[in-house]
A protein has these predicted regions:
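Acidic (Asp/Glu-rich) sequence patches and key acidic residues
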Residues: 1-194
Length: 194
């Protein structure tokens, strides 16, 4: 029987993207235009990278659905999406809110009522999708500024997969969610001074 040669690929190999979600559940009725988010990020010393196809009209629109925002060349961008109650993704909105509400109400913790009230009053939520195999500390900080923008400007409450929900005033974890896998989750970056 002939031997079958084993061929190995040298050099760096791309890992399969591993999606990681962070969200802000917002009570405000309308989402701010993306242009305000971009200005907020610039004010923090970041240089948001946006596709040249994104024009002023889109950046000034209140009715946006999603946008990829890069934080560093050579790194995958963060996908910032908006899911609205009663919008085109209403079914997704209802499923996500209902699923989280069921979990929160089934697990009695000291502050679960605060999370349940936030979810019941939620008009839209922002879901940031990150690739855990490609993000750096700089990317986590950049993502935390995006979360902070919506938390501050839209009466939001931050939720991070595998961690939980955070108090909007203190930044403290107030309701813990189970880990999403065996890997340790990154700590929530500390609140940046405004």
């Amino acid at each position: 029987m002939a031997e079958i040669p084993v061929i190995t690929i040298t050099g760096s190999q791309q890992k399969e993207p591993k999606e990681f979600f962070t969200r802000v559940f917002c009570l405000r009725k309308e989402t701010p235009p993306l242009g305000l988010l971009v200005e907020y990020l610039k004010a923090r010393g970041a240089t948001p990278i946006i596709s040249a196809e994104v024009n002023e009209k889109l950046l000034n629109s209140w009715n946006w659905v999603g946008l990829e925002i890069g934080y560093a060349k050579g790194r995958k961008p963060i996908l910032v999406t908006c899911v609205r109650k009663g919008g085109a993704q209403d079914e997704i909105f209802k499923q996500d809110i209902e699923g989280l509400l069921n979990y929160v109400e089934a697990h009695r913790e000291i502050d679960n009522w605060r999370v349940a009230d936030q979810l019941r009053g939620c008009r839209f939520y922002i879901a940031n999708i990150l690739d855990k195999n490609d993000i750096t500390e700089e990317g986590y900080d950049f993502n935390s500024w995006i979360l902070q923008f919506f938390e501050e400007n839209c009466d939001g409450m931050v939720q991070i997969d595998g961690q939980g929900f955070y108090d909007p005033q203190t930044g403290e974890l107030i309701f813990e969610l189970p880990p999403i896998d065996d890997e340790p989750e990154p700590a929530k970056p500390s609140q940046q001074p405004s």
